[in-house]
Amino acid sequence: MDSDQIIVIEEKNGEAEPASVVAAGPERFINRELSWLHFNRRVLEEAVNPSHPVLERVRFLSISANNLDEFFMVRVAGIKAQVREGITERSPDGLTPAEQLVLINEAVSRLASDQQAIWRDLRGILTEAGIVLLDGRDATKSQRAWIEDHFLHNIFPLLTPLAIDPAHPFPFIPSLGFTIGLQLARVSDGKSMNALIRMPGKIDRFIRLPPNGKDQSVRLMTLEQATSLFIGRLFPGYVVKGQGSFRVIRDSELEIEEEAEDLVRLFETALKRRRRGSVIRLEVDSTMPEELRAFVQRALSTADDEVLLVDGVLAMNELSQLTRVDRPDLEFPPYVPRHPERVRDHGGDIFAAIRKKDLIVHHPYESFDVVVQFLQQATRDPDVVAIKQTLYRTSNNSPIVRALAEAAEAGKSVTALVELKARFDEEANIRWARDLERAGVQVVYGFLELKTHAKLSLVVRREGNTLTTYVHTGTGNYHPVTARIYTDLSYFTSDPIIGRDAARVFNYITGYAEPSDIEKMAVSPLTLRKRMLEHIRGETAFARHGKPAAIWLKMNSLVDPDIIDALYEASRAGVSVELVVRGICCLRPGVPGLSENIRVKSIIGRFLEHGRVYCFGNGHGLPSAKAAVYISSADMMPRNLDRRVEILCPLLNPTVHQQVLEQIMVANLKDTEQSWQLLPDGSSTRMKAAKGEEPFNVHNYFMTNPSLSGRGKSLKESSPRRLTRRSERHQSP
């Protein structure tokens, strides 16, 4: 195979097919931004999934819209900045920033059009189910009277009509700000003017009307439609000649100076600057008159390619508010997470349960309460002398923060690493940091140039004449709310080696001293990349020597070129590579001569797949008791491997090893009901069970089957259904 050959992707009937392939050229990578858009399309496809209740389908539509907003605020904003600065450096797949923008705009245009079409269908289904969205013209006389009364008492006081003239310049519109633009004419002399009405951001988008007699249908009207009915109340003496809504999305990246004496004040200043970031996207109601649209564009300094004309509803992310309607028959049946019985076997003493044996808690199927309990018990336990904790994201009124504060107030040594650079949670984290400092917690902020993304909690307890270290590490945030909908793994252990490694990680973060003696864990940006490459290359060597060789990896994103190239090399050597990648995947699977032994699937369903699990056969194939199995906070992206503090933690206890490898990973690979198979061109197709094989839903399996490490004594009476994988590959339609 010549080193200067490249992958060529040919189009056939609208689908990309590999024509000739090798490893050298940039075409071996899928563009990161386009791969993300493919992922968001998979999310959107769940909004048309007939097996989901209609309010859940609305939720998926809202999620896809919210995802797209953040994509523009962060990714598109960054690429536009590169274009503005004249940067022409190519991405790993060979595209300049300007070329990427063209392809992004084309893909987003199709995606946005499909979102509106899906919403029109869902609106009809909602109407049939008794949830009716009224237009102003649909309202009856009595409904209009009620809306007017509601408007005058609950909306009118919040609105500020803004005439635009030399004395009243165009106001600042915040990111995601929703505004009605107006062309008005004065009744007395016909003089025209432009005006704006900014929609208040602190009230619900949808107004619920009272029931109509015996008809118990839920009737709703949007805030902007209700406002449009009574514009005369805001501009008396004027008539409306034209109107339309618009919404802006601004650059939300933070610019942080490298040198700063006070990191908190630095971030507070940067957050104020972010609120006034440049406009990246302008969404405009397609019914807005062209002259008014041009006026808004000029005022916001937006180019034509930054404007999206919307034939439908703006701010689709707010459709999630419809799911608050009390119609449980139109939602997924409620699910109550299990509490690990093994903790109950020890009278609720989580330290005793961990001392007995390592424990993996699988969220959201098993309750996050056990993580909260771990810290709360440490707070109350007089034998606990020290607690160390990382905080990347957490919830409002966080029980984690409260436990840390109470522990410090009780005289324990408490250290909290609060990451100020957690995107869109910066303000909340500044608030938590100050609350913790007031309680006596030693708060540190880690590295200015690195985000601390590791999930790590360490409790030191005096037991007799010795100190025992209890460790929790996981794949998800210390966030009780998202733990109900994100699939993640929490690992509890009192293994002295893991305890020493965890202490070294904290010392690295607080004291900047690079640890040279970590025993079992790997830590980015120091050793995690090296460990992953060693394992991948190890499987490659096994295959070349005729030994069993297999790699199973589960993550959110696969972007790093070195990791991808190592996986390509493994595939060419004959290693069986199975990847579960929810989001971005820049690797092209199934390409002859490059990646024919690599299969990639993405699972999209009721719960958001968030865990990272990395498994290597170690010369024994998979699954095997001899395999190397890790959980991690890190995805395989350059930022995680090089610009963040992350943890890769081995699972050494046989029970948790078996649980993660033979139960969790096998179930993920076995799933056919919620899985998409990734194709060489970066697109994906829904999977279906192979002929003769029963369909399998991974989320349903874990909702109905106990875990291996958490069952305790009851495992003998209630064992999880054992999973096996057929040798045949799942077939795509």
Swiss-Prot record:
Recorded superkingdom: Bacteria
Catalytic activity: [phosphate](n) + ATP = [phosphate](n+1) + ADP
Keyword entries, A-Z: ATP-binding, Kinase, Magnesium, Metal-binding, Nucleotide-binding, Phosphoprotein, Transferase
Changes after translation: An intermediate of this reaction is the autophosphorylated ppk in which a phosphate is covalently linked to a histidine residue through a N-P bond.
Region called Disordered, residue ranges: 702-733
GO cellular component term, pick one: polyphosphate kinase complex
Needed cofactors: Mg(2+)
EC code: 2.7.4.1
GO biological process: polyphosphate biosynthetic process
Pfam families: PP_kinase (PF02503), PP_kinase_C (PF13090), PP_kinase_C_1 (PF17941), PP_kinase_N (PF13089)
Descriptive protein name: Polyphosphate kinase
Native source organism of the sequence: Rhodopseudomonas palustris (strain HaA2)
